[in-house]
């Protein structure tokens, strides 16, 4: 819809999709930092977001994933009188289910990517729509399982476990050693 303008905090993919970036997401990346620098970064982000919500006549705010920070930002958005939509909702079924009360207070509509999540949010009285998983549209299988197993010299039978430590360099540095150790322990069994 050409009448809709989008502005946000994001990366190159969001910008290519037509979102006017008010700040690059890299400015918000503090994975693994500790101490005063991390605290200063958090304070900066909270102040930036609070000012952002009051700076323009926004119609709505769409938060994407990252519930640790985004549920807090949603508080500022609601306080500014904005409609709040949450895409890739907090996985309350997996951990910290007590967050549902924050979601009910701070989010107007949840967009879930897993079919069973809709029932959980419906039961809690949170308006919700199942929209499907973005990877199913973005990633089309290019190889059949037999070809992949041959390419990576894997047996034709048995389970294959992928180690996916993250998308950011710091995440990979922090998580890959633990994942490799876990894989080593599994292989010994």
Protein language model features and the residues they cover:
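Nucleotide-sugar donor-binding and catalytic loop/hinge architecture
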Residues: 144-162, 188
């Amino acid at each position: 819809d050409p009448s809709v303008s989008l502005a946000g905090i994001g990366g190159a993919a969001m910008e290519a999709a037509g979102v006017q970036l008010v700040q690059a997401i890299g400015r918000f990346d503090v994975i693994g930092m500790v101490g005063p620098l991390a605290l200063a970064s958090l304070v900066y982000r909270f102040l930036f977001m609070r000012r952002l919500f009051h700076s323009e006549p926004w119609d709505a705010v769409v938060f994407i994933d990252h519930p640790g920070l985004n549920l807090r930002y949603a508080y500022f958005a609601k306080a500014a009188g904005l409609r709040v939509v949450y895409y890739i909702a907090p996985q309350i079924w997996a951990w910290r289910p007590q967050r549902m009360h924050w979601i009910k207070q701070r989010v107007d509509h949840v967009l879930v990517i897993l079919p069973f999540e809709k029932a959980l949010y419906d039961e809690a009285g949170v308006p919700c729509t199942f929209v499907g998983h973005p990877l199913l549209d973005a990633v089309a299988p290019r190889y059949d399982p037999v070809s992949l197993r041959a390419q990576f010299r894997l047996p034709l039978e048995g389970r294959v476990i992928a180690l996916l430590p993250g998308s950011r360099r710091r995440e990979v540095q922090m998580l890959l050693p633990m994942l490799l150790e876990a894989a080593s322990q599994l292989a010994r069994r």
